[in-house]
């Protein structure tokens, strides 16, 4: 988001962002279920099987900034501050989150119906145009039936019903979690435990850790096993990459 100026000077910039998103999806194994490009910000609904949102967002915004500046002969930041991320429970809230995102242009009074906004994923998911490579629509349509045309029709009706509903972001807990009570509670407990682990001094935390010889004793000569050993040494036992 950039509160003071547009992050897109023209439609070419918008295509560049979507092309960059496609590259990031491929590199970080993301699934983009929904997107909406506004003038001074954009929204994405991203599924990250590898839990690498931060790395991917740095790549997405960084590469787009580089391409934007090169194209327009400018320097400096395109985006102001850090992005806002909300963790969404897939089973109960992801569909609503996707609907909320594609209705942004209507809430901003930029258009009266979602299909008039070219720069969201609504048109592709609704069957009006072909989906760009950066977009995954199968999961959303699968929630509305197995027959494509029927699913698209039900999706369009579902989106329009959202204009009469409440704001889903009013249900966000702790400014970062959207889900049912059990989901929120489990995540808060997990985060609390993670913070407690970080408080334990490193020497105490890794008091009984195996040495590197033990970790790698069964991986000699096998690249795949050695790579697995490196991951265990660094992530599980706190060795630095230099030590490994």
Predicted regions and their residues:
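Short Pro-Cys-Gly-centered "Cys-loop" motif that presents a nucleophilic cysteine in a tight turn
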Residues: 1-38, 47-243
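Amphipathic alpha-helical hairpins
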Residues: 43-44
């Amino acid at each position: 988001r950039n509160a003071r100026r547009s992050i897109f000077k023209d439609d070419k910039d918008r295509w560049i962002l979507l092309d960059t998103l496609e590259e990031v999806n491929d590199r970080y194994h993301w699934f983009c279920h929904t997107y909406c490009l506004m003038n001074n910000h954009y929204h994405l609904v991203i599924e990250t099987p590898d839990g690498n949102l931060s790395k991917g967002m740095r790549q997405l915004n960084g590469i787009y900034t580089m391409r934007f500046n090169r194209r327009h002969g400018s320097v400096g930041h395109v985006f102001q501050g850090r992005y806002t991320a909300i963790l969404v429970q897939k089973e109960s809230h992801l569909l609503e989150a996707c609907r909320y995102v594609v209705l942004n242009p209507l809430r901003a009074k930029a258009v009266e119906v979602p299909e008039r906004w070219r720069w969201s994923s609504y048109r592709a998911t609704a069957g009006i145009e072909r989906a760009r490579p950066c977009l995954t629509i199968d999961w959303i349509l699968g929630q509305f039936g197995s027959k494509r045309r029927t699913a698209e029709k039900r999706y369009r009706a579902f989106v329009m019903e959202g204009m009469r509903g409440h704001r889903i972001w009013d249900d966000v807990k702790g400014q970062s979690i959207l889900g049912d009570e059990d989901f929120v509670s489990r995540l808060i407990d997990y985060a609390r435990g993670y913070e407690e682990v970080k408080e334990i001094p490193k020497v105490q935390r890794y008091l009984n850790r195996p040495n590197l010889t033990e970790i790698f004793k069964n991986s000699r000569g096998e690249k795949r096993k050695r790579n697995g050993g490196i991951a265990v040494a660094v992530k599980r036992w706190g060795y630095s990459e230099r030590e490994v």
